[in-house]
Amino acid sequence: MADIIHLKAEQRTEFGKGAARRIRRDDKVPAVMYGHDHDPIHVTLDGHATLLALRTENPLLSIEIEGQKPMLALPKDVQRDVLKGFVRHVDLLTVRRGEKVDVNVALRITGESAPGTIAMTEFNEIEVQADLLNIPEVIEIDVTGLEAGTTIYLGDLKLPEGTSLLGDAEDVAATVAFPETEPVEDEESAGEDAQGESEEKAAKE
């Protein structure tokens, strides 16, 4: 079961770039909450707490606005400062317990393929549908002992219970191959090339 991260929020009535700058100066993050059964709710979150919460992939958040019932939410769009890394803005999708949600989950290679080969994923992450309280942190691809030329398709992946693939099952998830090597020039050829270049240069002089 997913851990729920609790974040306190303040509802805000000021909008626009100027208001957003003032919020960030106070080490807070402007955010908007939207869902199927309510109008967008504009809130302000604590900057440090939000940064820590977003270190987790697909964190399930409980947004607690004073005087209101806490609302479960998933971050759907996170804007970060390119240079300093702090969170500039967050879009939050409100959800309900028992609901299935569409999320992107990272792929990770596990195990070692056959000696002399390497395994590579075709995607950093894939889109799946999962139970709200059981969103996988990562989907592993076991390549133990696989030989060069092996192809693993999305449909081959072992997904956790309650999780289903949203992409094309025939898309390639990972491949096993021999690493590409640079052609090595032998010393004799290299010497002949160098001598030829020297003679050509001398002739021009």
UniProtKB/Swiss-Prot annotation:
The keyword rRNA-binding applies. Residues 178-205 are annotated as: Disordered. GO terms for cellular component: cytosolic large ribosomal subunit. Keywords: Ribonucleoprotein, Ribosomal protein, RNA-binding, rRNA-binding. InterPro entries: Rbsml_bL25/Gln-tRNA_synth_N, Ribosomal_bL25/Gln-tRNA_synth, Ribosomal_bL25_b-dom, Ribosomal_bL25_C, Ribosomal_bL25_long, Ribosomal_L25_dom, Ribosomal_uL5_bac-type. Residues 182-197 have a biased composition (Acidic residues). GO terms for biological process: translation. It comes from the Bacteria. One of its GO terms (molecular function) is structural constituent of ribosome. It holds the Pfam family Ribosomal_TL5_C. HAMAP family: Ribosomal_bL25_CTC. Belongs to the bacterial ribosomal protein bL25 family. CTC subfamily. Part of the 50S ribosomal subunit; part of the 5S rRNA/L5/L18/L25 subcomplex. Contacts the 5S rRNA. Binds to the 5S rRNA independently of L5 and L18. NCBIfam families: bL25_bact_ctc, PRK05618.2-1. This is one of the proteins that binds to the 5S RNA in the ribosome where it forms part of the central protuberance. This is Large ribosomal subunit protein bL25. It comes from Cutibacterium acnes (strain DSM 16379 / KPA171202).
